[in-house]
Amino acid sequence: MDYMIFATVSVALMLSSISATSIAVAFPIITSYFMVPLTIAGWIISVYQLGFTVTMPIIGKVSDVFSRKSTFILCLVLFVSASTACAFVDNVGLLVFFRLIQAFGGGGFMPSAVGIISEEFPETRQKMIGLFSSILPIGQIIGPNVGGWLVDSFGWRSVFMINLPLGAVVLLMAIVLLKGDERKEGSIDFLGAGLVGGVVAFLMLGLTFLGYDSLKGWSWALFLASAISTALLIRHEKGAKDPILDIEILKRKPFVAANLYNLIYGGAVIGVLSLIPAFAASVYKMSASECGLLLLPRSIGMIVASIITSVYIMRWGYRWPLVLGSGATVVSLYFLSKEPASIVFLYGIMLFIGMSVGVISPTANNACIELLPQKAATITGIRGMFRQIGGAVSVTIATLIVQTVGDPSRGYAIVFIVIAISFVAALPLIFMMPSRPGAGIERSECSLKRLKPTTKERVQ
């Protein structure tokens, strides 16, 4: 039964993965359909990351406090309903809105599922979470190829409609198989989540407005609003009963290092690499089906590397796989920035990128949880939030650069080089994170004893 539960949450994550990669393939067609600038169309992708940013830490807390089964099912219903609505809109503004709602559902899959897996497999948590991470590239194999075929055969709306029958099957599995659990004490920091969303949204809007002469004046006001929201967030979180961002924990170097690394990782993998189909369509003149096929070697590389890393992570530790994966990503981005090469060479680069990401993902996941394993779902939500912030902001910056430069080939080259440099700058952060399984637990427990008590604890 435990492995059937693992299969249920894994299929849900795969559904989210299929949806994300299908949209990446459909993105050039959707941009042409609505006839909007790239910076506006980019919100179809970046608003999804924004929704994840707000939702993941909330759902992590909700999953820790309330029933994991109810939380998981609620997220699934929200995701499928919004996906269906996206298929019927005829306005880019409405599409962006329903993509945000879709993200509110999809953003809950990972933290709630990790909480479920951590409870079902306490003795083999590292291995099972690593295997769970390998589900993402399976969806990334199916999504681009099926999505490319759907777009070429039935139009871009079909990539949203496919979530309805698949989601219904997963919903039935969840209702039947998942175990109910008792409510625990705690509260949800909705204001904190709203302030996090405000910080990122104001920053993204400010960056978008920089691309328009008539709106540039508003950019600085939006940047100021983002800064003010940041100050309000810090002040609120210091006094919150159950803060969405525990400021005292985030002051500790290992948590700071882990989250900054995930911010950069999200900017590259969730953000910029989601624009690969748009890059291939504009620079290499590929069709939707060809763009989908281009993502196949990346997904295969992710699966193979993720499974191998998950199996041997107890032996290898965390740091050197992260160094290896980061270095390989830098090399891949450098070659992507060069003049358009042969299609075969491009496929090779995508395979190499996939292997790099496959090494990084399960390692970074477990390195974060290692710092506070008793709060696995919450830590997963915070880690995911930083990744999504990186992804959302990087898409906004990337589309601004490409639109400003004018030449897609040169614009994307600049984007790839910027991300490569950020990965090089992030290498020292790896050596501030736990070195191996078990290394962070004792330090975390000792450090947590020295942390200031929450408002709730002071009252008690």
Predicted regions: what is each one?
Residues 1, 433-460:
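Intrinsic disorder in cytosolic terminal tails and internal cytosolic loops
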Residues 2-18, 23-27, 38, 42-47, ...:
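12-transmembrane solute porter fold
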Residues 29, 57-61, 65, 149, ...:
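Membrane-interface helix termini in secondary transporters
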Residues 33-35, 67, 88-94, 122, ...:
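Helix-breaking motifs and short loop linkers at transmembrane-helix boundaries and internal kinks
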Residues 54-92:
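Conserved MFS/SLC helix-loop-helix module at the cytosolic interface between two early adjacent transmembrane helices
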Residues 78-85, 90-102, 344-352:
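Paired small-residue
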Residues 101-134:
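Cytoplasmic helix-loop-helix junction between adjacent transmembrane helices
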Residues 152-261, 293-294:
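Hydrophobic transmembrane-helix bundles of small-molecule transporters
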